[in-house]
Amino acid sequence: MEEFQGHRELYRSWQHNFFYPLIFQEYIYTFAYDRGLNKLILLENVVDQRYSLLTVKRLITRLYHQNHLILSVNDSNQNEIFGHKPKKNLYSQMITEGFAVIVEIPFSLLLISSLDGKEKKIGKSTNLQSIHSIFPFLEDKFLYLNYVLDILIPYPTHLEILVQTLRYWLKDASSLHLLRFFLYECRNWTSRITSKESISFLKKRNRRLFLFLYNFYVCEYEYFFVSLRNQSSYLRSTSFGALLERIHFYGKFKYLVKVKDFAVILWFFKEPFPHYVRYQGKALLASKGTSLLMHKWKYYFIYFWQCYFSVWSQPRRIYINQLSNYSLDFMGFLSNVRFNSSVIRSQMLENSFLLENIRKKFDTIVPISPLVGSLAKAKFCNVLGHPIGKSVWTDLSDSDIIDRFGRICRNLSHYYSGSSRKKNLYRIKYILRLSCARTLSRKHKSTVRAFLKRLGSEFLEEFFTEEEKVLSLILPRDSSTSGGLYRGRVWYLDIICIHNLVNDQ
């Protein structure tokens, strides 16, 4: 009955666009700290033992008193719970986590209402949730395009921009004021969050709230951009024997005009439809148009961010590149359009001809340098790529050590399965294999050679090639490959995030 009452109150608040009272409800904090919804935050902060129901009740009691809404982080008396001193910002952290759940409510309800009656249609497109679905799209479209804009989406230069972007959707003024309080409450924050240190601190402070605000900011920008892209499929042009210049960005004319008694037809040029993909803060805009058109798109983005979001984006954050001469560094892959030429001999009666056939191919390559840097940062090798033992794992059992190394290899193999050239991936797996052997030999106070000689070289080889053997059983083999392992390209439809070693910056 209490759960039903809570849902009814939630619905009434949604009807009136009024979410501020929900901050006083206990079930909001239950949602915020449920391990299924907020597992990453619990694992990082390791403070779940102190977020008990009694702590939540004490927090809500203090919230009812205006004097305790703003909690001093330096007052040790206010911050004592159950006789010990927790983190300085325990209560403030709890409020921000609960508020992050509250601001997601209207958008979750809008999503549910938009999906009502469309279960069958949505069910067919669930595979599009995988980030690997981007690469088949790039393979199909980028082969026929000329230029690409490599865009780094700028962060808002002021915290108030995030609030102003949200206020068009969230009509509750009290909630907006509370959001401002959370954003400016931290002493370590400045009025600008453009530096990498400030962004990192904001993520650690409240990852869920930060991701919501940033994703909403990006979605607002993309909403306007998609509208522009749909309207710019046709551009109005004037011509007098030659194309002079586009004078409007929207609309088109479908009639004739008289210029000096000569009938001049207004030419209609269909704009090369641009293709847009984005992951996190990096986006790609590719088109079949000319270099002049791409420069117009570039400066449109700069002026658009400046005018609509008060965000200054430097021109060097947007690069114009020709696809035939450029490798895209996107989502952990190096991708490029490669030309494959083949010579075909054609015989016609007594004459023979040599025909050169040029075919485009979209290549996805595993970048070796960033991955070696990530492995060196994680202490699996040095900066030159020479494997070293993971000393902090020597206290674990042999099976746990092998399982951890094997899990990393499986994740990397799983993510880079669509690479057209896997030589670099095998180098990374070789580094991890020797690092595992060095870790085990260090634990048993032996040398790597003696350890492998005692257990056999197949001890680790079979384990680290497990996924390739599974693929070779369910997919056709390439007779030219050795060992019977599968060397083809596979894109998985169950990958929703990039592995930490892939996404390390």
From Swiss-Prot:
Gene Ontology terms describing biological process: mRNA processing; RNA splicing; tRNA processing
Query: Where, subcellularly, is it found?
Result: Plastid, Chloroplast
Q: Which Pfam families match?
A: Intron_maturas2 (PF01348), MatK_N (PF01824)
Q: Which GO terms describe its cellular component?
A: chloroplast
What coarse category fits the chief subcellular location reported for this protein? plastid
Q: Keywords of this protein's UniProt record, alphabetized?
A: Chloroplast, mRNA processing, Plastid, RNA-binding, tRNA processing
Q: Which GO terms describe its molecular function?
A: RNA binding
Question: What InterPro entries does the record point to?
Answer: Domain_X, Maturase_MatK, Maturase_MatK_N
Protein family according to the UniProt entry: Belongs to the intron maturase 2 family. MatK subfamily.
Functional note: Usually encoded in the trnK tRNA gene intron. Probably assists in splicing its own and other chloroplast group II introns.
Q: What is this protein identified as?
A: Maturase K
